[in-house]
Amino acid sequence: MWFFARDPVRDFPFELSPEPPEGSPPGPWVLHRGRKKATGSPVSIFVYDVKPVAEEQTQVAKAAFKRLKTLRHPNILAYIDGLETDKCLHVVTEAVTPLGVYLKARAEAGGLKELELSWGLHQIVKALSFLVNDCSLIHNNVCMAAVFVDRAGEWKLGGLDYMYSAQGNGGGPPRKGIPELEQYDPPELADGSGRAVREKWSADMWRLGCLIWEVFNGPLPRAAALRNPGKIPKSLVPHYCELVGANPKVRPNPARFLQNCRAPGGFMNNRFVETNLFLEEIQIKEPAEKQKFFQELSKSLDSFPEDFCRHKVLPQLLTAFEFGSAGAVVLTPLFKVGKFLNAEEYQQKIIPVVVKMFSSTDRAMRIRLLQQMEQFIQYLDEPTVNTQIFPHVVHGFLDTNPAIREQTVKSMLLLAPKLNETNLNVELMKHFARLQAKDEQGPIRCNTTVCLGKIGSYLSASTRHRVLTSAFSRATKDPFAPSRVAGVLGFAATHNLYSMNDCAHKILPVLCGLTVDPEKSVRDQAFKAIRSFLSKLESVSEDPTQLAEVEKDVHAASSPGMGGAAASWAGWAVTGVSSLTSKLIRAHPTAALAETNVPQRPAPEGLPAPAPTPVPATPTTSGPWETQEESKDTEEDSSAADRWDDEDWGSLEQEAESVLAQRDDWSTGNQASRAGQASNPGHRSQESDWSSWEAEGSWEQDWQEPSPPAPPPEGTRLASEYNWGGPEPSDKGYPFAALSVHREAGAQSRRDSWGDDNWEGLETESRQAKAELARKKREERRREMEAKRAEKKAAKGPMKLGTRKLD
C-alpha cells in the first residue's frame, strides 16, 4: 500500500547543502555541495531530475552514472555512492570544485603558478591516456566544464556523459545538443573530412588543445582564436600547436604528448611534477629512495601550493612515519607542513605523532625532536608534557652522546613553563645539579648554568633560595672560562630573586673573588655585577623603606613575567634558544679549547707564570643595570654580546664535538678522579649547602682531586712549559698575578662549602700524560723507520765479492 512506501531520498546517507548550487557545468547535471550524515565529511553531489519529455537526456545521464561507477583511476572523478529513482539521479563524489570556478577564485588571490598548471594538465592527459590506450574509450567531452579540482589542488576528469567505445561497439558518438559543448568539436567532425584516416585519440587531443588555451587565456570565444597561443608558456607552445593542427593524423597520442612535455626543458619537467609522481608510487619505492626523497623535500615545500602540502604531502608524511622506515628525516618536512595548519588541525594530526616520536629509541629521531621543539611546543598542553613527553626527554640527560645531552638542556628552556611542581623543582633540578657537577664537557656545564638562569623565575620560592646561589657559585669555580662568565651573568639575570642579606653575605664575596680571575672577560663581568649589586645595597641603605619594594620578588610565586625581565638583562631570549658558548666554540674553536688548558693556578715558585690567554668577545650585559661610567672597551664587548641571541646552540654536534673529545682535559681529570674514588672510598668532597638533596641529584661538588704525582727534581721543567718561539713570559701582562697567587694558595689550604678542587693537579697530570703520549709516538716512529730500512736491505739481496755497495 502507498502509505507503507519509504522515500529513498530521505533514507539516502548523504544530504544536500542548503547553499545554492556552485558553478554547475553545462549539461544535464546540477552540482551541489553535500555532506555525509554519519560523519559530516564534505562531498559533492551531482543531481539530475528526470523529465518525461527529455528521454534522450535521461539515457545520457544514466550512461554517465554507470561509467563513473565502474571507472576507477586516480585522475578520474572518484565515485562514492549513488541513488537512482524514477524522479532523480544522485551521484556522490569526492568534494570537488569546477575548474572554471577554481581558476577564477585563484586569480583573485594572485593566480595559479605554472607549477600547479603543469601538474594539473599532466593529470588530465594521463586520464585521457588511460581511457584511450587502456580502455579503448573516447571521452568526447574534454573541456573546462569536464574538469574538477579537489581540496588538494588535484585535477580530476569528469563529464563522462558522451563517452563511447573506440572500437565501434554501440554505434557512433552520442549527440550532445548543447552549443556550449559542441564548439570544442574538431573541424573534421563538422565537414566530415578525414574520418577514415584519423586516429581514435585525434578528437580528444583537439579538445585538449582547447582546454590548454582556456586555462591560460580564459573562455574560448571561437575556434579561430586557437591560432594565437596568447599567454601559453613558450615551452608548451610547440606541443600545443600539434594538438590544434588541422590534420588529425599528426595529433600525438596522449602518452607521447606526456613524454614530449616531460623531456628536459619541457613544460612538465619540474620539481613539483617529479614530487607528485614520486608520491603516487611511494608505496613501491625502496627505503633508500624514500630517505633521499624526504631529505630533499623540505627544500621544495616553500614553492609548493599550501593546499597541496596540507592535503597530499602531509598524509604521506604521516603514513611514512607510522608504517614506513623513514625515521627522523620525516620530521623536518612534517613540521614545515605543520605551519599551514590551524591549531585544531595541528592537535589532531601532528601532536599524536610527536608524542609517539618522543618514546622512540632512535637517537637521530630524539635529537631532531629536541632541535625543532620550538615549532610545536605551543600546541602541547601541560598534562601531555608532564605525563608523556618529559619522562622520555629526561633520559637525554644521561645519554652518552654529548650532543643529545646539550640539546636536552636547551629544550628545558621551552618545557619549563609547562612543567608541574615536581618535575620542575625536584626532577629537573637533580639532573641540572648532576650535569653542572659531573659532566666532562665544558660547554654543557656552561649551557646548564645559562638555562638555569633563564628558567629561574619559574622555580618555586623555596627552590630558588636553595638552588640559584649554590648553582651560580659553583659555576664561578669552573675551570671552563665561559662557565664562570655564565655564573656571573646568572647572578645578574636573577638579581631580583635574592634578599639583601644574601647579596651581601653570599653573592658579593663570590663575585669579589672573581675580580682577580686570570681571564679578563670574567673580571669585566664580575665588576659589572658587583656595581649593580652594590647600587642596590646602597639605595636600601640610604632609604630603608625601599627594602620591601626591592625584595618583593624574593618570596613571590613563580612568574613568567619575572623571567622575561631577568633574561633581558643578559640579552637572553627564551624563544631564541641561544647559547652562551656557541660563539666561542663555533667562531673560535681553538681559542675556546685553550681556555680549558690555561693554568688556573700559579706556576711553581721561581718559574715565570704563563701569560693569560685572551678569549674572543664574550657576552656582556645590557639594560638598566649598566652604569654610565663604563669604558670604551667594555662598550665594544657589550655590542658583541648582544649578538648572543643570533647564534645557534648547535655547538657540540658540529666541529667542536670532535675537538673537545680529543683535547678537553676534563675527560682525563674525571677518569683519574673516579679511579681515586674507587681506590679510596673515604676520600669524599664535602657536601654543599644544598645537602638535603640525594647525593645523585645535589649541587655538591663531585669533581675529586686526583692523587698528585711525584714532584720532579727541583729546577726541572717540562718541555711543554718552555716558550720555544719567543721571549720568556712575564707577569706584566696580568696585573693581578700576585693577588691570584695568594688567593688561590688560600683556597688550597681550606675546603669551603662548595668543595673547591685542586685543578692544578688535573692539569699537571694532563701535561704528563701528553708528554708520555708524545714519547710513545716517537718510539713507534723510530721502530717503523728501522723496519723499513731492514726491508730495503733484504730486497737488495747478498752483496757480490770484490764490490761494495753504498746504502
Curated annotation (Swiss-Prot):
GO terms for molecular function: ATP binding; protein kinase activity. The keyword Electron transport does not apply. Residues 667-691 have a biased composition (Polar residues). It is found in: Cytoplasm, Cytoskeleton, Microtubule organizing center, Centrosome; Cytoplasm; Endoplasmic reticulum-Golgi intermediate compartment; Golgi apparatus, cis-Golgi network. CDD domains: PK_SCY1_like. Residues 632-656 have a biased composition (Acidic residues). Residues 760-796 form a coiled coil. The protein kinase domain is predicted to be catalytically inactive. This is N-terminal kinase-like protein. The gene is SCYL1.
